[in-house]
Amino acid sequence: MKRSCENDVSVLRYGHRPGRDDRMTTHVGLTARALGADQVIFPDNATQSAETVSDIVSRFGGPFDVERTDGLNATIREWSGTVIHLTMYGERVQDVTEVIRETCLHHQPLLIIIGGEKVPSDVYEWADWNIAVTNQPHSEVAGLAVFLDRLFMGQELEQEWAGAEHVVVPQACGKRVVDAELTTEADEMNAEK
């Protein structure tokens, strides 16, 4: 799956408590990028998370946009597309994802809201869909990962990353990271054989 950064799928992190949420907010952005979203929108006070995710994009490729806003509510209310709120109180993901994929994905921009603190009741009303992964308390990052994988039907796992400085080489054992230029040269040499 080639990446085309059209911002069809955006993830909005609703709320951020500096110090307490830094790691989780960063993981929301990294998960959004790795599993097929085109952009993440962080609260304005999530500076460290935005910088970390932007650094990963520059080192491991994109396209992927990282934005910050002090107008989370306005972003949701003014969204010109479908708004999806991931919450343990919503409809079961397995019951609604196919409908969302068929009627919304590639037809209009999607905004996926992930809570970082107590989400106001207005967000439930502004959302076109309130969706739950298991209707049980667990990590918002896990919920995002499951939802994106179901939305893209696993195709996001085949992404190619443009502009990467480094490439992770899959291996059964150990770790191997190479310069992207070396990977491209090796691929070209293998193609010529």
UniProtKB/Swiss-Prot annotation:
Residue spans crossing the bilayer: none
Amino acids binding S-adenosyl-L-methionine: 86, 115-119
Keywords from the UniProt entry: Cytoplasm, Methyltransferase, S-adenosyl-L-methionine, Transferase, tRNA processing
Record has Cytoplasm as a keyword: yes
InterPro entries named among the record's database cross-references: Alpha/beta_knot_MTases, tRNA_m1G_MTases_N, tRNA_mtfrase_aTrm56
UniProt-listed Enzyme Commission number(s): 2.1.1.206
Cellular localization per UniProt: Cytoplasm
Pfam families in the record: Trm56 (PF01994)
GO molecular function, one term: tRNA (cytidine(56)-2'-O)-methyltransferase activity
Keyword Amino-acid biosynthesis: no
Alphabetical list of Gene3D superfamilies matching this protein: 3.40.1280.10
SUPFAM superfamilies reported in the protein's UniProt record: alpha/beta knot (SSF75217)
Subunit structure comment from the entry: Homodimer.
Role this protein plays: Specifically catalyzes the AdoMet-dependent 2'-O-ribose methylation of cytidine at position 56 in tRNAs.
Homology family: Belongs to the aTrm56 family.
Name of the protein in question: tRNA (cytidine(56)-2'-O)-methyltransferase
Organism: Haloquadratum walsbyi (strain DSM 16790 / HBSQ001)
